[in-house]
Curated annotation (Swiss-Prot):
The keyword Repressor does not apply. It is an enzyme of class 4 (lyase). Belongs to the radical SAM superfamily. NifB family. It comes from Frankia alni. This is FeMo cofactor biosynthesis protein NifB. The lineage of its organism: Bacteria, Bacillati, Actinomycetota, Actinomycetes, Frankiales.
Length: 510
């Protein structure tokens, strides 16, 4: 295999070349597989839509970037987990932004970002309020970007209250990805999440408010899927309030045609100023979140595509998932500038990405490694999950490679690992242990928190690790592994060894 593509930061030199070539049809996501979700995509049109969408495809998020533009300030509902504060540059939560944009400024920003981050494939309008509560700037932004940036996928996120009203408009503008936040289908649950909704000139509270919201959300979802618009449903997991109920939510939205369900953890802290933050409502542990995602995925034996790699992005996020480059694109970088949209350069960059993805997929096929998705050569077959697996954490900057120093990681990707098995099941945020070569040991609590976050993992894979963290991980019973290789290959190989070497009582089904 050749080295990583030029768009990815990587050590000099490439990976070992594979011993045998696999068919090129295995490459990238332009197959009939779901490319990282647990169910197949038999429709070639859908497969093409999600091929380079970093939110809808787990594999694509290693290669393609997204950006959000904050053009929608107002909201028509109040959530107990939300506080739309402006100028919160140090926060990474949905609904926060540093700057509100006009549609014209949004277009200018998209042009600048698309020229510099050529792997940016998706534009989303996700706040800081609700896009459909601000239809004029939302749809004007979509019109401008569609006119000038024809290769960028258009998405919007909504609470769904006004969704049925705008389904035809969304379809007419060729927006083919819509995310709806649905946290309940039972108003009794909803009244504990939503203090009020503003509907047709009146403010409603209590169960009546939640009933109106739920009816509109489900009607909007059904109408979108009838028009073959791909829908992702976001749900915030709130322990003790809707955690058990979300299994029913998942079952319902699947029945209405939702393509993907994203169960996210509640982000709750007093400094956020939310009702839940101020009242001490806790969020779920990573283990609780994974258990609920697993239940939703396999409810009643019917598989639901679950998003496992969400980063709960800001309303002005820019870059790869897990990477926020918003500070590189402040208003002074795009306001008043005339940028020629580099369509040819972007197409060349995307072709390079796809060549690399083809090599990665071919190597995976040659080594007979399953990732939890059905394979293109046997589309009807279930992936064979080993009876015994362990969890393995990976430090990566993307491109499908273990290529990050342990101390530089702001997040770890969590994989199920076993013989011939490497399945991404979660990402976990941590505080970077190192901010440079000279300040890796000043705050031992950062390392302690990272180790606690990875306490259920059998190993950590990274490109480099210092002696101190290595010893601390070993003391905690976590094996540190220095390696530079394909993630799937490294995870499957390490998993096979760990499953073989560990006592039966230590190996389970995470």
């Amino acid at each position: 295999m050749t080295g990583e593509p030029a768009f990815a930061a990587a050590p000099a030199g490439g990976l070992p070349r594979r011993s045998a070539q696999a068919p090129a049809s295995a490459g990238g996501c332009k197959t009939t597989t779901s490319c990282g979700t647990s169910a197949p995509v038999q429709d070639p049109e859908i497969a093409e839509k999600i091929a380079n969408h970093p939110c809808y495809t787990a594999e694509a998020h290693q290669y393609y970037a997204r950006m959000h533009v904050a053009v929608a300030p107002g909201c028509n509902i109040q959530c107990n987990f939300c506080n739309r504060k402006f100028d919160c540059a140090n926060e990474s939560r949905p609904g926060v932004t540093s700057t509100l944009l006009t549609p014209e400024d949004a277009l200018a920003k998209v042009n600048v970002v698309a020229s510099e981050i050529k792997q940016m494939s998706v534009l989303g309008i996700a706040g800081p309020g609700d896009p459909l509560a601000n239809p004029k700037p939302t749809f004007r932004t979509i019109e401008l970007v569609a006119r000038d940036c024809p290769d960028i996928k258009l998405c919007l996120s909504t609470n769904g209250l006004r969704l049925p009203e705008f389904v035809d408009r969304i379809a007419d503008l060729n927006v083919d990805h819509v995310t709806i936040t649905i946290n309940m289908i039972d108003p009794e649950v909803g009244e504990r999440i939503y203090p009020w909704v503003a509907w047709r000139g009146k403010r409603y509270t209590g169960r009546e408010a939640s009933k109106i919201l739920s009816e509109q959300q489900l009607a909007g979802l059904a109408a979108l899927t009838e028009r073959k618009i791909l829908c992702k449903v976001n749900s915030v997991m709130i322990p003790g309030i809707n955690d058990e109920h979300l299994v029913e939510v998942s079952r319902t939205v699947k029945g209405l045609g939702a393509f993907l369900h994203n169960v996210m953890p509640l982000v709750s802290a007093p400094e956020h100023g939310t009702v839940f933050g101020l009242t001490g409502q806790r969020g779920p542990t990573p283990q609780e979140l994974k258990a609920l995602q697993d239940r939703c995925e396999q409810d009643d034996g019917a598989e639901m595509n679950m998003m496992r790699h969400c980063r709960q992005c800001r309303a002005d996020a820019v870059g790869l998932l897990g990477e926020d480059r918003g500070d590189d694109f402040l208003p002074e970088t795009f306001q008043g500038r005339e940028i020629v949209y580099d369509l040819a350069g972007r197409q060349q960059a995307h072709e390079e990405i796809e060549r690399w993805r083809t090599e990665v997929a071919a190597t995976r096929q040659t080594l007979n490694i399953a990732t939890g998705a059905r394979t293109p050569d046997v589309p009807a077959a279930e992936p064979v999950r080993p009876a015994e697996v362990v969890l393995v954490a990976v430090a990566t900057k993307g491109s499908g490679v273990v290529n990050q120093h342990f101390g530089h990681a702001g997040e770890f990707w969590i994989y199920e690992a076993g013989p011939g098995w490497a399945r991404l099941v979660q990402t976990r945020d941590v505080d970077r242990y190192c901010n440079g070569p000279s300040d890796c040991d000043e705050d031992a609590s950062k390392l302690d928190r990272t180790i606690e976050m990875l306490s259920d993992c059998a190993a950590v894979l990274c490109s480099k690790i210092g002696l101190g963290p290595r010893e601390a991980l070993e003391e905690a019973g976590i094996e540190p592994v220095e390696i530079y290789d394909l993630i799937d290959k490294a995870v499957a190989e390490i998993g096979a060894r760990l499953v073989t070497d560990r006592a039966p009582a230590e190996v389970g089904t995470p």
